[in-house]
Amino acid sequence: MSEEYKKRILIQYENYLLQQDNYVYLATKNSVNWSRNKITPGTAFMNKLVNYLKSDQIQSLLNTNRQDMNIIITDMYEVGEGEKKIVNYVHKYLHNTSDTVMVYSPDADVILLCMLMPVSNLYMLRHNQETSKKFKRNIYDLINIKMLKNNISYYINNNPDFSRENFIVDNINYDLVCISTLFGNDFVPKIETINVKKGFQNIMDAYLKTLIELKERNTYLVRKVNGKFNLSLTFLRRVIKNLLPEENDYIKHNKLYNTYVTAGQIKNVFSYMEINSENIVSVYNEFMREYGDLKNLIKNNGNLTYFETNDQFMNSLKKSICIIMDDQCVNTSYLSNKDTIKLLRNYYIKTREFPRVNINLNTWSHSTDDRRHRNIIRENNYNKYQIEIYKFDKMLDEYYVKFNAQPLDLSRNKIEQFYETYFGIILLDKNKNLTEEANEIMRDYTEGLLWVFDYYFNDKTYVNRWYYQHEKAPLLTHLSMYLDGINHDYFNDLLSGLKKYRVKNIKNFFNPVEQLIYVSPMIPGIIKLLPSNYRSYITSDHLDPFLKTYFIDVEEIVDQLWDQKISDEIDCRSIPYLNKCIIKSIEKPSSSEDKLFLTAIRKVKPTATSHKRSKSIEPDF
């Protein structure tokens, strides 16, 4: 859809570009673009890449001076996510090994998966994109997983805001991996009122509070019994209840969160008071003024007594800065005020600067008139056409309105409307209890959370039919009401019932070519990536009636978007990227529709080429 819309923009700016020097129009129209769709399983490019990697030529090069190295290539024809294959391989062949194991991955989720691996000497190598960009050279982080787990457990057991504890290292790490995945994953929508990236400290605090509340019962969120991981309903209920104040604050001050980018962090930094729209600017400015005073005193060897005894300011400062010493961020929460100031002095002597605070009064940007976007446009010397493309990609100016990219209004009087709009239900009955249909929504989301838990902790299979059928997540308040109304047996039955979604016979599931067709709009750029027999069938007059209704008409959708000043077709509320927006005319296929799709597409008579590109087997680990 995005590329089709950009074609319209190019046509609109054709005359302008023709008037520019250096054949700008021709260079734009005929620019060399490499479609990312080519790296999708089922394409000719991926088939060639697999054959190339497995060729004698490459295998010989890989083994040069590495005769003892066992190189395993698992490709797209072996189903499964790459990280899942790594985890399963380690579990099967390296379980409790005394050897050192290192995993290389750009995916942050793999850090969590590494924390669950049964290996003592485990490291993860990760390319640090942000630092590499800053220093204009490749910089890698080497993460010692055992040290990471010990540091996390030390933080939990020695948190200065709570009593000193002795919770078990493995249990703490199981729990935090679980918490991290439940509140931030690619399988179910995030809960709108809980921002994992900008408010993870609140989640950590709620977890630690729950851990201490249930200490006498020796209860953790995750338990390992007879080699299988189980999720505690009791703990889950309690940790969600401990997060409800955060949700209530988000709802009460919804306008504030929808205005300031770091509102969640600001709330945490100044947790001793209630931050609202009226005081946020003055509180922040006063804090920054005091930080400026502290920096000047350190620079000039002034009297620091005021700051050494000012717990309120220093606690806020500790929460808002990261002091890097020896390439490590020092956790200042355990330090006294005097030691923190001493560390700041040492940092200044070493770098001649002070750490920046991680909070600011930046607002969510919706216009090219905002300073950040003005600077980008000026630095890149964009012409009018490029500015239009930039506005489109970032959903700025008229696109902000056209695509309904405003913040989602979750103020108190808009909650029921939220459920009506995104779930099509009435939330509460006359007694303020969840309606039957609302309970179904909560059940679906609970099943989703359990599926995510099972995926990370237990499930070693590769093919699964489960999916979350809604576009949004319910709010914690109503999820909590639902969990209070179910018993442990029902909860455990939901977890054990997930096995029914596992695909036992891979022949009954999508092969690479079928999956490419299933997830892609049948536009010319995609169709030409298919084997010739599929191309002929899809463009013929004999296309199966089901497929005629299944394939979306991208041009029709783009026509509507182009013509309407405010689209009734697309919903981008609180969605940062255009490709994640909700297209209302596109519904998620049901499992029965999946079967109809496979029946229809398998009418295509296979050829030698399509057969090669349609192979599908399971790894042996």
Curated annotation (Swiss-Prot):
Keywords: Exonuclease, Hydrolase, Nuclease, Virion
CC terms in the record's Gene Ontology section: virion component
Annotated compartments: Virion
Protein EC: 3.1.11.-
Main location (coarse class): virion
InterPro entries membership: 5_3_exoribonuclease, Xrn1_helical, Xrn1_N
GO BP term, example: nuclear-transcribed mRNA catabolic process
Superkingdom classification of source: Viruses
One annotated GO molecular function: RNA binding
Similarity section: Belongs to the 5'-3' exonuclease family.
Name the UniProt record assigns to this protein: Putative 5'-3' exonuclease R528
Organism of provenance: Acanthamoeba polyphaga mimivirus
Highest classification ranks of the organism: Viruses, Varidnaviria, Bamfordvirae, Nucleocytoviricota, Megaviricetes
